[in-house]
C-alpha cells in the first residue's frame, strides 16, 4: 500500500495511533521509490538498509506524539554531507568519498526522527539550472519525462513531485530550490541567509548558498524548516536570531497586507502564459483582501551579470580544495605534481564546473578584479538597497519564479547563456540574502507555473502565511503528475 498522498501530519497520526509502524511506512516509501525512480532518476543512492534499521529503532523506542516528523522518510541532496554514506555532489571528482561526519542539518533530521532514505541527484556542485549537469545521469521532470526538472536541486524536486518521498532537502545559490520546485509543481523555500547552518554543505558560493526544504504543501514545508533552522557555532555565517514556529501564521487572514509587484519581473523574456498565471494569482490575493501594487526594483536587471561574477569567483576559490591529493578522484599516469593537479581537475570536473572556475579565476585576476569582481559587489549593494526600499512600505514581493515553464531535455545544453537567464527572477533574492518561496500557481501548456513570494530578512512566517492563504483557496497544489498515482 502507498501512503504517498498523505501529509506528514496524517502519517504522524497513523504512527501515533499504531495503525502503521515506522518500519512499515519506510517499506512503503521504498516501494514508492522502486515503482517511480526508473522513469525519474532522482536518486544517486538509496540507503535502504540504514533506513530500515533507523525505522526499527524508532519503533523500538516508540513514536513521539509531539514531534510531527518522527518516523517520516526524507531524501537529501547529494551536496549535504552524510556520515558513512557516499556524498559526491554528483561529481566524478568526489566519486567514492565517504564523509567521516554529518552536516549539521543531517544531525537535525535524525534528532527530529526523520529517516534519511537516500541521496538525491543534482547538477554537479550545484552548478546548473536544468539537472543535466550531473556527472551520473540527468533527472527527468515529474510532469513530463521529456522535460528538464530544473536545477540544481533536480532530484530534490522531482522525488517529491513524483510521489517517491514526502519531504526533501535542497540547496539554493541562485534559485536552485525555487526553480525546480516551480518546474515540478511543489513548494520550495530558500530561507534567509544564515537561518540554516551551512556546516557540511559542499560549498559552491559561500555568500549565496543556503539549504532549504521542499514539500508538496506549504505547511509541510514550514514543518521541515522548523527542524533544520537554528544557530550553529560550526558555521561562522549562521545567525542566532530566534527561530519561531514557522507554521504559527498559517491559516491567518491576509486582509490589508501590502504586496509589491515589481514591473521588472514581468518584462522582456517572460513567457506570456506564465505572466498571465501570475497576474491572475495576484488578483486572487486581492480578492482575499491583500493590497497589491506595482513597484520598481531598478537594479534587478543586473542581477544575472552580478551573480555570475560573484558566484563563479567564490566557486573558483572553494573548488581549489579538490586537487586529487587528499580525497576524491586522482588521475593516473602522471609525470609530476602539477600534472597531477591539472589531470585530476580536468578529468574530475564536468564542463559547466570548469566553465565557472575559469570565469571566476578571470574575474579575480589582477587586471579584472576592480573592473569585474569589485564592481559586482557594489551593484549587489544597489540590489540590496532596492529591496530594502520596497520593504519599507510592503510586506512581501510577488512575481513569477521562472520566466518560462520547463523546457525540453537537451534544448539548452549548448547554450549556457540562455540557461543562466532562466534564473533571472530568483538570483536577486540570493544576492540580497532574503527568504523566497515558490508555490504552484497554475499551468502553461500542461506544465506547472510557480509563483515566487519574497519576504523581509528572517520573516519566513509572513511568506508562509500568504502562501498558505493562496494554497487554501486554490487547487493547483492538489493536481499531481500521472507518475504520482502509479
Curated annotation (Swiss-Prot):
Biological-process GO terms, alphabetical: translation
Stored Pfam families: Amidase
Catalytic activity annotation: L-glutamyl-tRNA(Gln) + L-glutamine + ATP + H2O = L-glutaminyl-tRNA(Gln) + L-glutamate + ADP + phosphate + H(+)
Polar residues bias: start-end ranges: 132-144
Molecular function (Gene Ontology), one example: ATP binding
Domain of life: Bacteria
Region (Disordered): 130-158
InterPro entries found in the cross-reference section: Amidase, Amidase_CS, Amidase_dom, AS_sf, GatA
PROSITE patterns per UniProt: AMIDASES
Keyword ATP-binding: yes
GO cellular component: glutamyl-tRNA(Gln) amidotransferase complex
Keyword Nucleotidyltransferase: no
Alphabetical keyword list: ATP-binding, Ligase, Nucleotide-binding, Protein biosynthesis
EC number(s) given by UniProt: 6.3.5.7
Active site: 77, 152, 176
Family, per entry: Belongs to the amidase family. GatA subfamily.
Subunit structure: Heterotrimer of A, B and C subunits.
Described function: Allows the formation of correctly charged Gln-tRNA(Gln) through the transamidation of misacylated Glu-tRNA(Gln) in organisms which lack glutaminyl-tRNA synthetase. The reaction takes place in the presence of glutamine and ATP through an activated gamma-phospho-Glu-tRNA(Gln).
Annotated protein name in UniProt: Glutamyl-tRNA(Gln) amidotransferase subunit A
Organism name: Lactococcus lactis subsp. lactis (strain IL1403) (Streptococcus lactis)
Lineage of the species this protein comes from: Bacteria, Bacillati, Bacillota, Bacilli, Lactobacillales
